[in-house]
C-alpha cells in the first residue's frame, strides 16, 4: 500500500475526525486533505499540529475536487451536524443528507471507496431493536432530526443502483474520548462528569421517568473513540488494498455490544480520579423526556462475521485511559 496516496477526511477538526487524523498520521499517512468548518476557534487545537496536505473549507470541497488533479484513494466522511437538540431539520438535511449525497456521487464517479458516519440515533427508542441489517432503516422512527437525517441518508444509499467502489456506513453508538471538549453540551457524560467532579465533587444525572428503569440505570452502549478509529482504519486498509469484498458493503453497528448504565460510567470516572463516587439525581427537562433513549446496545455480529477480531475497551478500561491520560493531564489525542 502506498502511504503517499491521497486520503480525504471530512469532519477532521471534530472529535472523531481529529482522532482519525492522528491515527492515520501514526500509521504513516500524511497526504490527507482535511475538510471541515475551520473557522471554529475551539476546534483549532484538535487539528493544527497534525500532519496533512491541505485544509479545505467544507463548502469549498466540491469545487476543489473538480480542480484536483490527483484522485484520492478513499473518502472517510465523518463530517456532520451532530447536535441532537437542534430541532430545525433543514440544518441537518443540508449537511447530513444533501452534502453526503454529493460525497457519494463523487465516489461513484471516480470509482473510489467511501466510509461514512451514520449513527445509533437512527434506531429511535429501540422498539425495532439494534440490528444493522438493510431492511430495518425503512421501519425506523428516530426521535430527533439528527437521527432522522442520518437514517434518511442510510435509506437513500441502500436504494442506489450506482455505488462507490466499496462503501460502509457506520452506526456510531455513544462515543467518548479525547478531543471532544469543543462539543460542550453535546460532549460525552464522562467529559461532563469529570468537569462536575473537578468543580463541585458531585455528578448530577437525570432521574428516570420510566418505571422499568431505576435512576442512573438507563443503559447505553458506550464505545471508546480509540476503538472506533481502529475499525475505520481496518476497513480503510482493506478497501485501498482491494481486499474488501463488495458483498460486505453496507451498514455496520459500531458500539461494544454491551450496554452499561450511566451510574457505572460515572463510578468509573470517579475511580479514574481515585475518588469515592458522589452522584445526585436531578429531573430531566420536560422537552427531552419524549426524545430520550433508555437503552441502546449494538448487535456487533455483522462486523465480527466479516473478520474484525480486535477486542474493544471495557467501559472501565476506556474511561480510565481517557480520564488519566487525557482529561486529568489536559492532553489531546
Task: Kindly label every feature range from the protein language model.
Residues 7-27:
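N-terminal Rossmann NAD(P)H-binding glycine-rich loop of SDR-like oxidoreductase domains
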Residues 6-7, 75, 251:
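Conserved hydrophobic helix-helix packing surfaces used for dimerization/oligomerization
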Residues 49, 58-95:
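NAD(P)H-binding glycine-rich loop region in Rossmannoid oxidoreductase-like domains
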Residues 34-61:
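Glycine-rich phosphate-binding loop and adjoining beta1-alpha1-beta2 segment
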Residues 6, 30-32, 113, 166, ...:
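Residues at the starts of beta-strands that form the adenosine-phosphate
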Residues 199-333:
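C-terminal substrate-binding subdomain of Rossmann-fold SDR/epimerase-dehydratase oxidoreductases
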Residues 94, 98-102, 109, 122-169, ...:
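Catalytic helix-loop patch of NAD(P)-dependent Rossmann-fold dehydrogenases
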Residues 10, 35, 75-79, 114-120, ...:
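SDR active-site strand-loop-helix element
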